[in-house]
């Protein structure tokens, strides 16, 4: 390809850059006064106090001393004609000289023609200028966005309440020159190249346009190999098509790469800038920029022959175009520095033009805006009593509902209503004697586009036409006879009219109308404004103030924007965020926070930056008692085999963690420690080589850097863990695999340098030699500790504070932190701007104030607490401001919220440092602690700044005073350097908050015995001193707690042995009632029976028995019972405690022995005697505790067993099946009549002999089957993909089946 065009394109790009610089440079001196030399005729107004136009230049003192209208109301304005289009950069105002008349606020409007005005906007809203406070001072405003116009209009909004409207004004700027081309919708400009193909690596295309229609092509170019570029108006939005060297892509079939803008058919100027470098491009429309990457295979754009502007002409067919042409004006059209319109005006040979003129023709249409949905209306008159009716107009709106037209017909022919209902047009003709007729047409008409409506009626025929499409007629209109009325109400009805004159079954219309025709005659809306035609209320005439509130989209995190005329709304579904603008994450920032919310181990979504730009990431939170591990899986955690790789053809595997690197980095940076286990199995496959050699294997980390060290080693040291420990197989090497042996070996270790994690890729290059094999495994990313949640500082004096760089925020700001204090008041934080500010403070012990000003005036939100906030307990505060609302939340108290104004300042203007713990003036300082401060999801590291700040200390002790209540069931809160933990040593529960029950499943012969002869505490420290409970002195207090579930009665739950004869037994009797047997001595025995219901009902029941001296209380589930022993009763210390079956039955009480016969079949949980937890000791610390377990004790969950199959709890004794059918109404007894005792004895002897014979036979068959089963187990083969744990599960299930079968026999 010829290189000359490429050089030319680069050269023209440089020229275009100089051209843009030149435009910018001219603005430095664009501040000349523009009204000083205007004639009197240049000024006009809505009305004048003198009845004629008055000069109103700044500092004017003659005559009336400026302009004042005849009446001071919201419909007044002052206008000036500057003669030509100029660039306006500033305005200034004064009051009327020598009077009490001045304007305190106003709006600015501008126009090229004196019609179709446009309001000045700034920060995305219609700007409200601050005016004067007296008649003589000058208030000057520099326009942030300069405007180019010929006509300027000042519209007073507020004025001196003790005077009237009065103004003297000045406009500053400079002359403005431009090249303009007018396209009539049937013509175009062609820019033909000097060579066949123009090939560009970079492009800059800029222009301004104003359009009459919603559709039309602005420019187009294409090449024979598929390159094309097209900029096209589609439904009032600009669509850009751009493709580089892809013959498959066609303009007509592909979707646009970028779409920007909205309502661009408003006949106002809009700017466009396209900048492309290779495949990267920026597309800007009216200061809204979208970055994208082009399609195609190369970096060059190859355009053949020509570029067309205004349309896409068909070759060899003059006057024929592929798409709808542009209808409007284009200004300052530059293509890579070439002024296309200037070439056309000078009739250069490169330009071929159709019917294009070089001055912008302006259609004289006058739009009107219906502002208020309750009171806006327009009344126009027509010719009454004509046989028929004809009305037409155009409208645009965002609202689904509104009255468009209401008119009372003559000759009693009824009332005609045209309504927008749910975005559909509904025509209704109502007569008193009949129900009326209806016509429906269209849908989605609240899309902001202009829609034309025409109603034509003559005799009994009615036609409704929408956008040139006639609606279908109702089936029967023969009864209609329509005669035109005198009054036509558009948009709404006045309050003082009767229903017959104007009907409005729906709210008033909010939107714009234009081109109103009645009886085929156009209506002059300027005459309406001047009061000579019709009447109106709450209208803006000669102005369509429609605004797209969804451009830009202020719904964050992918929220979908919808709007009405006055507001916008965000749909946050499926985004993971909530709030008015989808700003607030619904997920927590770490596993530590989930733990603090009382969650247990499971999968969670973690949003590390909260309301920041990063989305949530799914992790597994393993919430245990010591460390809270957060695990992120990737797509290849299994063992992967590698063969055939060498340095020329390396093996590479990329790991995907289900999230972006930015998400993973935020997660890692917020953790105290992170690690990944890496393993390399090798046989004649080297891993790292020598420390100075080229590594054979390496991995890529977060920064896309190569890391030639392995798990267990340090960053920058090309070694494995065995190299640092000097334990490698070959001392000459620093990795086991580098020994290059013929035997399998491995190098395994943890990578824990956070700045390098996670592992994103592994590369292996030494598996291509003879007998060379390797396999690798990279474990998931695992982290623990939250560096942010417990990040706290203590302010020791009220004069101390921390300062940080300014808080960068545009539209949304949220602040979250915890605090605790004993002070009466204090400022938490403050940040200032020139006028704006943001401050949070505790104004009193029960009040928190969020004070904020973004330019619309200060707002104070107050939350009052019914309890004191200076109680030295942790409280949290969340404050937020967005475009929709401002809110303040303290703890779980009701939120204080205020909606934002529909128009006004949106963007924060904050530039000072962020002050935490006080104000910049060092007043109202905060005394106490602040913790976990987050601004817009970003953590503020308070502790690091406190290390270098006097009067502020890192950390804040005393978490247990606030969070100790989280440690439940006897757990003890323990202070830690970071946060706190719950010590469950003396609790029968476990888990982070001692909430997880410890349960076990008992068979009929299971026995758990705890001996009290040796002191024991459920810790790993066996050297603790003995408790007083182990002395011979009897305890004055005793507490016994347990939960049980069974279907067996009678049964023994717990047996506490004091001596050979004295005991305490908790059991269920034959009828399922609870009995407590208390044998204190040979002479003193007590039996307490609680006969509330049959407790052997497969449900979990709780028993709590508490004795304080002679007072005994027993709580059975929710019922409480009290007993009192005699004062002479003597209590002894316990020697042993048995759960389940008591194996040493000698001397056992007969009733207890009967309950013990069948043992206990069921589930026990949360067993505690004083601070001893025998079941916990048996399941968790059997090796260091004085506990003995006989037969099978299976850890389980009583609650889950209730929810699942209750038959899991069973017994082998079918004659007393605890789950058998039983009439609970029938009393049970163990009394046996004496005359049947002998017969029973004989039967028992015969039965015993029979069962002995059966038992011998059963034993024989069982041994035979057992040997057969063992041989089966030896021959059993497992699939290769079944791991050892799965094999154990299979074997366990098979064994259980065999045991059940034998038990049944």
From Swiss-Prot:
Keywords: Cell adhesion, Disulfide bond, EGF-like domain, Glycoprotein, Membrane, Repeat, Signal, Transmembrane, Transmembrane helix. It holds the Pfam family Laminin_G_2. The keyword Disulfide bond applies. The chain crosses the membrane at residues 1236-1256. Its main location: membrane. SMART domains: EGF, FA58C, LamG. It is found in: Membrane. Residues 25-1235 are extracellular. Belongs to the neurexin family. May play a role in the correct development and proper functioning of the peripheral and central nervous system and be involved in cell adhesion and intercellular communication. This is Contactin-associated protein like 5-3.
């Amino acid at each position: 390809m010829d290189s000359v065009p490429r050089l030319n394109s680069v050269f023209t790009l440089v020229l275009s850059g100089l051209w843009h610089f030149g435009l910018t440079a001219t603005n430095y001196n664009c501040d000349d006064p523009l009204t000083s030399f205007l004639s009197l005729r240049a000024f006009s107004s809505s009305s004048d106090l003198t009845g004629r136009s008055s000069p109103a230049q700044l500092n004017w003192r003659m005559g009336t001393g400026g302009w004042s209208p005849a009446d001071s109301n919201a419909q007044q304005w002052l206008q000036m004609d500057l003669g030509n289009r100029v660039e306006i950069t500033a305005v200034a105002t004064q009051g009327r000289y020598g009077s009490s008349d001045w304007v305190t606020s106003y709006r600015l409007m501008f126009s090229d023609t004196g019609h179709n005005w446009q309001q000045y906007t700034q920060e995305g809203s219609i700007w409200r200028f601050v005016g004067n406070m007296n008649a003589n001072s000058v208030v000057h405003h520099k326009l942030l966005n300069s405007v180019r116009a010929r006509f300027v209009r000042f519209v007073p909004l507020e004025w001196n309440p003790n005077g009237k409207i009065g103004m003297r004004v000045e406009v500053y700027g400079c002359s403005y020159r431009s090249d303009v081309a007018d396209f009539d919708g049937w013509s175009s400009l062609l820019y033909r190249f000097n060579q066949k193909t123009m090939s560009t690596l970079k492009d800059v295309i800029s222009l301004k346009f104003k359009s009459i229609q919603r559709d039309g092509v602005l420019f187009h170019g294409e090449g024979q190999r598929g390159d094309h570029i097209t900029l096209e108006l589609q439904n009032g939005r600009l669509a850009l098509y751009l493709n580089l060297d892809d013959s498959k892509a066609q303009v007509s079939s592909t979707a646009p790469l970028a779409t920007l803008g909205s309502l661009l058919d408003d006949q106002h100027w809009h700017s466009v800038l396209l900048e492309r470098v290779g495949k990267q491009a920026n597309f800007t429309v009216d200061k809204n920029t979208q970055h994208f990457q082009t399609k195609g295979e190369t970096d060059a754009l190859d355009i053949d022959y020509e570029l067309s502007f205004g349309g896409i002409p068909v070759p060899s067919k003059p006057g024929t175009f592929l798409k709808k042409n542009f209808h409007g004006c284009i200004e300052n059209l530059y293509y890579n520095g070439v002024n296309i319109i200037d070439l056309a005006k000078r009739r250069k040979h490169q330009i071929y033009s159709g019917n294009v003129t070089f001055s912008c023709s302006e259609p004289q249409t006058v739009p009107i805006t219906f502002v208020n949905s309750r009171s806006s209306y327009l009344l126009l008159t027509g010719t009454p009593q004509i046989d028929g009716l004809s009305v037409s107009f155009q409208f645009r709106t965002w609202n689904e509902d509104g009255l468009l037209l209401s008119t009372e017909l003559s000759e009693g022919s009824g009332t005609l209503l045209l309504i927008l209902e749910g975005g559909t047009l509904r025509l209704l003709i109502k007569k008193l004697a009949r129900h009326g007729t209806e016509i429906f047409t269209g849908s989605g008409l609240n899309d902001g586009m202009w829609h034309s409506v025409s109603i034509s009626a003559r005799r009994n025929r009615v036609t409704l036409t929408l956008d040139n499409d006639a609606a279908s007629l109702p089936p029967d209109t023969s009864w209609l006879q329509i005669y035109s009325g005198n009054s036509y109400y558009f948009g709404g009805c006045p309050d003082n009219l009767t229903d017959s004159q104007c009907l409005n079954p729906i709210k008033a219309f909010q939107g714009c109308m234009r081109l109103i025709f009645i009886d085929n005659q156009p209506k002059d809306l300027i005459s309406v404004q001047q009061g000579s035609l019709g009447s109106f209320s709450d209208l803006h005439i000669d102005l369509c103030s429609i605004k797209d509130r969804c451009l830009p989209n202020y719904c964050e995190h992918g929220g979908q924007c919808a709007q009405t005329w006055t507001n916008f709304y965000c749909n946050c579904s499926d985004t993971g965020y909530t709030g008015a603008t989808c700003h607030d994450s619904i997920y927590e920032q770490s596993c530590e926070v989930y733990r603090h919310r009382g969650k247990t181990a499971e999968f969670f979504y973690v949003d590390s930056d909260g309301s920041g730009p990063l989305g949530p990431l799914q992790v597994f939170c393993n919430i245990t008692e010591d460390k809270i591990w957060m695990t992120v899986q990737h797509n290849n955690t299994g063992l992967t085999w590698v063969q055939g790789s060498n340095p020329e053809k390396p093996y590479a595997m990329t790991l995907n963690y289900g999230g972006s690197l930015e998400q993973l980095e935020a997660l890692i940076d917020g953790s105290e420690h992170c690690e990944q286990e890496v393993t390399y199995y090798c046989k004649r496959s080297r891993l790292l080589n020598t420390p100075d050699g080229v590594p054979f294997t390496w991995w890529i980390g977060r920064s896309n850097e190569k890391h030639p060290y392995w798990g267990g080693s340090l960053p920058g040291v090309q070694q494995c863990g065995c190299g640092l420990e000097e334990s490698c197989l070959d001392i000459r090497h620093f990795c086991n695999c580098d020994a290059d042996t013929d035997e399998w070996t491995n190098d395994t270790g943890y990578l824990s340098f956070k700045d390098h994690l996670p592992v994103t890729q592994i590369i292996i290059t030494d598996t291509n030699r003879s007998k060379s094999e390797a396999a690798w495994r990279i474990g998931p990313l695992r982290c623990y500790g939250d560096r942010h949640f417990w990040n706290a500082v203590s302010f020791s004096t009220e004069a101390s504070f921390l300062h940080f760089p300014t808080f960068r925020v545009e539209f949304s700001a949220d602040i979250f932190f915890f605090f605790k204090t004993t002070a009466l008041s204090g400022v938490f934080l403050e940040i200032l701007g020139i006028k704006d500010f943001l401050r949070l403070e505790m104004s009193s012990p029960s009040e928190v104030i969020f004070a904020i000003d973004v330019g619309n005036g200060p707002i104070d939100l107050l939350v009052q607490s019914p309890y004191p906030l200076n109680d030295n307990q942790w409280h949290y505060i969340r404050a937020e401001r967005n475009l929709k609302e401002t809110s303040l939340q303290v703890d779980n108290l009701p939120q204080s919220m205020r909606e934002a104004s529909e128009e006004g300042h949106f963007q924060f203007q904050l530039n000072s440092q962020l002050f935490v713990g006080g104000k910049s003036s060092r007043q109202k300082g905060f005394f106490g602690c602040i913790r976990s401060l987050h601004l817009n999801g970003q953590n503020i590291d308070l502790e690091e700044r406190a290390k270098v700040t006097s009067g502020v200390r890192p950390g804040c002790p005393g978490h247990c005073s606030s969070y100790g209540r989280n440690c439940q069931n006897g757990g003890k809160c323990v202070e830690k350097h970071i946060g706190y933990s719950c010590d469950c040593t003396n609790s029968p529960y476990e888990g982070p908050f001692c909430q997880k029950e410890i349960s076990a499943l008992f068979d009929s012969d299971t026995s758990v015995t705890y001996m009290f002869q040796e002191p024991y505490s459920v810790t790993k420290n066996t050297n603790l001193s003995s408790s007083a409970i182990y002395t011979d002195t009897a305890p004055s207090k005793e507490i016994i707690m347990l939960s049980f579930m069974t279907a067996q009665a009678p049964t023994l739950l717990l047996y506490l042995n004091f001596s050979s004869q004295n005991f305490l037994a908790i059991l269920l009797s034959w009828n399922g009632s609870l009995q407590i047997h208390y044998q204190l001595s040979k002479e003193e025995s007590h039996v307490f029976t609680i006969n509330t219901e049959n407790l052997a009902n497969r449900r979990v029941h709780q028993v709590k028995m508490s004795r304080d001296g002679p007072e005994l209380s027993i709580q059975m589930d929710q019922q409480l019972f009290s007993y009192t022993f005699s004062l002479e009763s003597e209590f002894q210390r316990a020697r042993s405690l048995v759960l389940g079956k008591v194996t040493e039955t000698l001397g056992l009480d007969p009733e207890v022995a009967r309950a013990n016969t069948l043992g206990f079949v069921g589930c026990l949980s949360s067993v505690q005697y004083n601070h001893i937890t025998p079941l916990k000791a048996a399941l968790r610390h059997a090796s260091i505790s004085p506990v003995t377990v006989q037969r099978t004790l299976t850890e389980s969950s009583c609650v889950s067993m209730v929810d699942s199959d209750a038959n899991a709890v069973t017994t082998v004794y079918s004659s007393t099946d605890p789950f058998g059918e039983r009439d609970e109404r029938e009393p049970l007894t163990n009394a046996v009549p004496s005359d049947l005792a002998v017969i029973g004895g004989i039967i028992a002897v015969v039965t015993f002999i029979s069962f002995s014979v059966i038992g011998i036979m059963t034993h024989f068959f069982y041994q035979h089957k057992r040997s057969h089963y063992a041989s089966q187990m030896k021959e059993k083969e497992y699939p290769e993909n079944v791991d050892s744990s799965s094999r154990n599960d299979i074997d366990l299930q098979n064994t259980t089946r065999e045991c059940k079968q034998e038990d049944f026999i």
